[in-house]
Amino acid sequence: MALEERHRIRSPSDPPDTAAGVRPLRLASASGAPFYDVVALLASAGGLSALGAILAGLPEDFPGAIVVVQHLEPRHRSFIADILSRRTKLRVKEAQDGDRLQPHTVHIAPPDYHLLVNPDGTLSLSHSELVHFVRPSGDLLFESVAASFKDRAIAVVLTGTGSDGAMGVQAIKKMGGTVIAQDEGSSEFFGMPGAAIKTRTVDFILPIDEIAGALVTLFKGEAA
């Protein structure tokens, strides 16, 4: 799959040789190792369907670890891991403090806890204060992923109200990572993707049915 230029959003910070709209091709290593380590997904209102569409489109051998923040009602038990596990061949689990990131695995933030990724690949849960009125916070997840994995991280902002994720995508971009936002046409609510796009750090704006394929392509190093 090739990511079409019409989806590429050029940042003012891009080097001059990307004026055509696509950054230079970065090739996978000779060993065939994936070009990225982790994908961080953020969703809010309308997000369950969007997350399901992405995970359903990823192959069983997708090499990356996936971490997810979905804004949830904090006072009730979450069944999101059970629901999403029926949509994908990947392993899906609710994250626990001290878990270690695993390839082919989706780690979902539990209700009312921030999910953080540490440099050693372990996960931490925090009940610290709300960030922009939400817990778990996509901003905190993205910032921790950026600090831990730098240019080997991809952040994806999906449907949702508000502006969670807008600060975090800037951290991802600052450390050399890649940012994807769901397009307006396929978003049930465009608040969060729109806020991310306004930061001018988004690399690709894609309809929901193209995001899984884009992730596979990026991990292969075929386009970035």
Task: Describe every region a protein language model picked out.
Residues M1-A224:
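Strand-loop microenvironment adjacent to phosphate/nucleotide-handling motifs in alpha/beta enzyme folds
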